[in-house]
């Protein structure tokens, strides 16, 4: 019932697509950014592992607190804003990925990591609130399982796909714009559906 509900409810379906793209990019980032820092900047494994995560998660900590508070305040007047915030977060986060692969100073790369982490939190903060807005309470756990299973199945492909791209292109720099494009597409889809279906799907289960 969880999969059926998620895949037949437009808002939940697009949320799942967005979540799949979200996890795909995060998995690709976590897998390959340490290697990128080692190859491009000569960092040790320990330094590359630390720098790939530290700047991102420090910024994400601030981002998730801001996004959660902002969503709760605005959603009182217009609940679809939660999905709007998710879509905007993906699009703005994607912008930083396009710069990571460029020929920039290391400190600028770290700023991009932080910017990406800050805006990814806008998606994080609203995942389950959006899902539960448009799915029946009796199926919340089943729908969550469907969303998570689908997202992780798609995300698991990222290391292989990016690895194949690296082999064909000779470096990792070209993979970051691809990750950015994934988030932009997902973000646009979420903005569209938040406007066309969110309230309708909410009303169906809250009559």
Predicted regions and their residues:
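A membrane-interface helix-boundary motif in multi-pass transporters
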Residues: 44, 81-84, 164-183
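Hydrophobic core of transmembrane alpha-helices in multi-pass small-molecule transporters
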Residues: 106-122
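Cytoplasmic membrane-interface "Motif A"-like loop-to-helix N-cap segments
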Residues: 72-89
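Multi-pass alpha-helical transporter architecture, strongest
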Residues: 96, 100-102, 177-207
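Conserved glycine-rich helix-kink/hinge and helix-boundary motifs of the Major Facilitator Superfamily
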Residues: 16, 49-50, 87, 141-145
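A late C-terminal transmembrane helix in Major Facilitator Superfamily
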Residues: 132-169
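Interfacial helix-cap and linker-helix signal at transmembrane-aqueous boundaries
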Residues: 37-38, 70-71, 75, 162-170
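Extracytoplasmic gate region of multi-pass secondary transporters
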Residues: 7-65, 120-124, 128, 158-159
């Amino acid at each position: 019932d969880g999969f059926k509900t998620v895949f037949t409810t437009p808002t939940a379906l697009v949320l799942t697509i967005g979540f799949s793209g979200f996890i795909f990019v995060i998995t690709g980032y976590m897998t390959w950014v340490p290697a990128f820092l080692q190859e491009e900047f000569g960092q040790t494994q320990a330094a590359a592992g630390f720098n790939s995560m530290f700047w991102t998660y420090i910024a994400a900590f601030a981002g998730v607190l801001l996004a959660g508070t902002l969503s709760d305040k605005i959603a009182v007047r217009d609940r679809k804003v939660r999905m709007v915030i998710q879509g905007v977060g993906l699009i703005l986060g994607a912008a930083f990925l396009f710069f990571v692969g460029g020929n920039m100073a290391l400190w600028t790369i770290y700023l991009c990591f932080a910017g990406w982490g800050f805006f990814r939190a806008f998606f994080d903060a609203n995942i389950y609130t959006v899902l539960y807005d448009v799915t029946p309470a009796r199926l919340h756990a089943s729908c969550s399982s469907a969303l998570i299973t689908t997202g992780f199945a798609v995300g698991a492909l990222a290391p292989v796909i990016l690895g194949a791209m690296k082999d064909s292109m000779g470096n990792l720099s070209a993979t970051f714009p691809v990750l950015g494009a994934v988030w932009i597409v997902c973000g646009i889809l979420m903005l569209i559906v938040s406007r066309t279906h969110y309230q309708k799907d909410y009303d169906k289960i809250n009559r």
